[in-house]
C-alpha cells in the first residue's frame, strides 16, 4: 500500500512539473524541474531502480524519491533554495521530508554544491528518524568531487552511505564519468571496484524549464 501511495505521489509531482512547464512563457521562466533515474546493478542481489523528481520555483523546492531510504519506500521533501558567489559559486537547499512504505520516518536533509574553475563538489544527505524503531535511524549521504574538462564531460570520485543494499564497507566509493547533451545528463558510477564485487550505478536525468 505504501509503495502504491509513493508511486502516486511521485507521479503527481511529475505531472505538476509538466503542468508548470506548460504555463505562459513569463511564468514558465520562473520554474525548473528534473527527473532522474539511477539503476543499481548489484553483484549478489537483485538490481533495482531509484527515481527522483524535483520541482523548483525561486526559493521553493519540492522533491519526491522512491527506493532511496529503503526498497519499497517513498519519501517527499520540501526545501528552501539558497545560492551565491561568482568566482566561487555555491548552492544550498536545506530540506525536511517524510518517508513511508517498508520504512517510515521523518528526516532533516540537504543538497548543496560549491564550484570553482573546473572543479566542483556536490553533496546530499539526510538523517532519517525511524518512527517504528529508533535504533534503526540512519544517516544517508551521496557526495561527488568532480572535474569538468569540457562542457559535456564530468569525471571524478563518488562516495555513498546507504542501507538499501548490503555492502562490505560502511561508505562505498569509486570513480564516475558523466556526459551532458543539452538537457540530458547521463553518468556511470563504479562503487567499491577494489573489493572484487563492485556495484555499478547507471544514472540518466532530464532537466525541464525554459532556456
Where are these regions (language model features)?
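N-terminal non-globular leader segments, chiefly Sec-dependent signal peptides
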Residues: 102-104
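Short, solvent-exposed secondary-structure boundary motifs
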Residues: 40-44, 134-135, 165-168
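Onset of an N-terminal alpha helix
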Residues: 28-32, 46
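Transmembrane beta-strand segments that form the barrel wall of outer-membrane beta-barrel proteins
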Residues: 31-41, 53, 58-70, 76, ...
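Cleavable N-terminal export/targeting peptides
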Residues: 1-29, 209-211
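A mid-sequence, solvent-exposed acidic-amphipathic segment
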Residues: 133-146, 156-160, 164
Amino acid at each position: 500500500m505504501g509503495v502504491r501511495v509513493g508511486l502516486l505521489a511521485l507521479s503527481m509531482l511529475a505531472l505538476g512539473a509538466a503542468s508548470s512547464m506548460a504555463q505562459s512563457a513569463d511564468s514558465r521562466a520562473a520554474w525548473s524541474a528534473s527527473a532522474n533515474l539511477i539503476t543499481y546493478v548489484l553483484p549478489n542481489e537483485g538490481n533495482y531502480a531509484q527515481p527522483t523528481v524535483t520541482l523548483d520555483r525561486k526559493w521553493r523546492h519540492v522533491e519526491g524519491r522512491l527506493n532511496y531510504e529503503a526498497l519499497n519506500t517513498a519519501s517527499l521533501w520540501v526545501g528552501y533554495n539558497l545560492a551565491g558567489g561568482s568566482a566561487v559559486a555555491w548552492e544550498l537547499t536545506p530540506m525536511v521530508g517524510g518517508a513511508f512504505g517498508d520504512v517510515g520516518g521523518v528526516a532533516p536533509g540537504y543538497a548543496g554544491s560549491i564550484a570553482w574553475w573546473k572543479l566542483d563538489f556536490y553533496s546530499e544527505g539526510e538523517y532519517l528518524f525511524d518512527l517504528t524503531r529508533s535504533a534503526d535511524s540512519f544517516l544517508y549521504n551521496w557526495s561527488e568531487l568532480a572535474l569538468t574538462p569540457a562542457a559535456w564531460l564530468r569525471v571524478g570520485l563518488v562516495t555513498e552511505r546507504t542501507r538499501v543494499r548490503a555492502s562490505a564497507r560502511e561508505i562505498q566509493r569509486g570513480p564516475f564519468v558523466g556526459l551532458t547533451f543539452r538537457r540530458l545528463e547521463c553518468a556511470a558510477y563504479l562503487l567499491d571496484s577494489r573489493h572484487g564485487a563492485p556495484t555499478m550505478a547507471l544514472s540518466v536525468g532530464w532537466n525541464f524549464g525554459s532556456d
